[in-house]
Amino acid sequence: MAEAENIAIVRRTYDEVFNRGNLDLVDAIFAPNFKNHTAPPGMQDGPGGVKALVTMLFAAFPDDRHDIEDIFASGDRVAARVRHHGTHARPFMGLPASGRHVSQEQMHIVRLEGGRWAEHWGVRDDLSFRQQMASPEQGG
């Protein structure tokens, strides 16, 4: 697949799955054996893990957004610099709802195979994200 097509697939995934919560597309966009090398603890691989992740994010951040700030491809891999942000309206990963708008920088590398996500690696500023959500008593 051409690099431009791979970029379009990743953009579509962020727009429709991660920003709109369209779980109906997950099985078509993610390979059955999809491997997320940086999944949250306890999250399964495959499309089921993606659905669980998106559901978890929208449960905690009803206005959850992932804005692609930079994206490029080389062969079967796409790299994207993403800003993840939303309002922490419900508990998330052990932290009670803060009502704060939180933001996190992320870097993602996706390997595509046959037009579908086959593997994912990500780097996130999880410490800063948790600090933004935490109350002063919790170190926020």
Where are each of the predicted segments found?
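C-terminal and inter-domain tail/linker signature
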Residues: 1-140
